[in-house]
Amino acid sequence: MEGERKNNNKRWYFTREQLENSPSRRFGVDPDKELSYRQQAANLLQDMGQRLNVSQLTINTAIVYMHRFYMIQSFTQFPGNSVAPAALFLAAKVEEQPKKLEHVIKVAHTCLHPQESLPDTRSEAYLQQVQDLVILESIILQTLGFELTIDHPHTHVVKCTQLVRASKDLAQTSYFMATNSLHLTTFSLQYTPPVVACVCIHLACKWSNWEIPVSTDGKHWWEYVDATVTLELLDELTHEFLQILEKTPNRLKRIWNWRACEAAKKTKADDRGTDEKTSEQTILNMISQSSSDTTIAGLMSMSTSTTSAVPSLPVSEESSSNLTSVEMLPGKRWLSSQPSFKLEPTQGHRTSENLALTGVDHSLPQDGSNAFISQKQNSKSVPSAKVSLKEYRAKHAEELAAQKRQLENMEANVKSQYAYAAQNLLSHHDSHSSVILKMPIEGSENPERPFLEKADKTALKMRIPVAGGDKAASSKPEEIKMRIKVHAAADKHNSVEDSVTKSREHKEKHKTHPSNHHHHHNHHSHKHSHSQLPVGTGNKRPGDPKHSSQTSNLAHKTYSLSSSFSSSSSTRKRGPSEETGGAVFDHPAKIAKSTKSSSLNFSFPSLPTMGQMPGHSSDTSGLSFSQPSCKTRVPHSKLDKGPTGANGHNTTQTIDYQDTVNMLHSLLSAQGVQPTQPTAFEFVRPYSDYLNPRSGGISSRSGNTDKPRPPPLPSEPPPPLPPLPK
């Protein structure tokens, strides 16, 4: 296999006699003209490759295909403008960057006929072009014998410059010369890639007035690259290269960096609008100072940084080095080093983007350091390209840390603002009962307040459970009333006593279930006296029905926040802990006393209501408005109470309430109300624990509310009693 491979490799290297007897020569093409045709085809491939956005490796591979093709075929039979698109189409597939046939044809048309509009894809001309390109691709494959893997000199340039620890200037110049050798000479047909690499490095050494010292073994650097290379061969090929450069027209010396074109297009509008002429003159001056070295330095800026990873990879390494120098320098265009420099606006990428173009004025004795300095001036992107990843990270570590600190400070400020606002709301809530009302309901709350003031406390408390039960129908107005009542009770202890009296009256009317009331009353006396206020419900005694339904509602997140927590905690946005904390500490002693003395009485009736919600709902069937609320509540309270039995508290109810508290707690923490959360957790357990008992105890009152609750709601404050007889 290796022998066959060597023979195949030898097949594509020709002697001078063979080159002089090429098919084109046999068809009467002048030697200089043939070389010019090759250079033009390479120039077209470079232009198309940039427009198609393929890597420089793909472009170089296509150029080698073209050179080899014309050692078998003649330019007279296959014009270069026809073969180049097919060669690039094939190379793109070989290098795993395939492009659509339609795109290749359109780009070729744009490069060859920039003034004409693109052909219609349905036209005969376009279909003919498609057919011709496909046929030419097949011909190229057969001509090349399907030998599509190409070894480029760039890989060996990178290896050698690493080996001798060459400076960046030297490495960049050598790499640039390797690309020029493909575009402008037939070295790829005469010498192996290692030999061409030695020629490029040797030329770069002369260019930069640099001499690579002899190794400690007494060997010259090129002996480590290719043993067949001699100093005489290097001098001969260098001289030939320079002669070709002198003969080559300026328009064929331009080798673009396709990424530079994109960067130039982005800045073209700004540059053209501001000072196009001035910038052009400035760049021309800089180019005249150190033209080719500048370009080479820019193109090669990444080669040295990538060399560390490259040495062991022949093809992939070569591609990486190619891509390195070409693709990673956005601000540069490739210009082959030439004795004279010209910017010609006739070619595709030659608009005022010439900012990125670098002409090459070949004065060999130029100093590499000057070239590198001017290269820094010409290309803003080069410095960044030269920095290794570690250096870049170290360089920007402080900036990143500062940015991170700024972000953290901003986040902390936002959280503190949220916490401050929440605390203000809570403090305001403690002092002013009206603030406790749920924010979204405030609008509707105002019109209702006068009416609520007129309404009896009993009616308000009865509404509280109704609001909880009648979630869909009258949740909003009832919640408002309930909250008003809650705050009034918290601020005025007399209101609690009045409500107790009212509830007693209702209790007398609904004496049907005293036993249950007594049972629940026990829990209410010692637990609800403290948990009532924290809950922040109407008069802090939302009946068991209400709380059971509310807690079950908590499971229904839609209503849980609107009904249950609107009544049990001031607002979803305010920390339940804060509100409860404030309410509990402000009034717990007083209300506990009042609730103990008074809740015993009114809590009894409310508890029976909870125990017999179904019966009560049937009793209140006559009540148009309150009955549906009771009925809807019945299932929830029943479900909650069923397992609880004596206390009328359900473990599921407790869990639901706990889940809701946890959810609100997470919401508060998300908003940054961190200070209040510890208190929230202190009361979460008592909340749920007392809530269920309270459901029993408070249900005494709220049970009252539940039973009586249907009547008051329909007729509101004045007519609550009339509906009951009905």
Swiss-Prot record:
Subcellular location: Nucleus
Expression across tissues: Ubiquitously expressed.
ADP-ribosylhistidine, modified sites: H487, H530, H556
Pfam family, one: CycT2-like_C
Coiled coil: 384-425
Cross-link Glycyl lysine isopeptide (Lys-Gly) (interchain with G-Cter in SUMO2) mapped to chain: K342, K415, K481
Comp. bias intervals (Pro residues): 710-726
Motif Nuclear localization signal, and interaction with Tat-TAR RNA, chain ranges: 253-270
Record note on domains: The histidine-rich domain (HRD) region is intrinsically disordered and promotes the formation of phase-separated liquid droplets that enhance binding of the P-TEFb complex to the CTD (C-terminal domain) of the large subunit of RNA polymerase II (RNA Pol II).
Quaternary state and interactors: Cyclin-T1 is the predominant cyclin that associates with CDK9 to form a heterodimer called P-TEFb. P-TEFb forms a complex with AFF4/AF5Q31. Component of a complex which is at least composed of HTATSF1/Tat-SF1, P-TEFb complex, RNA pol II, SUPT5H, and NCL/nucleolin. Component of the 7SK snRNP complex at least composed of P-TEFb (composed of CDK9 and CCNT1/cyclin-T1), HEXIM1, HEXIM2, BCDIN3, SART3 proteins and 7SK and U6 snRNAs.
Listed name of the protein: Cyclin-T1
Organism: Homo sapiens
Gene that this sequence comes from: CCNT1
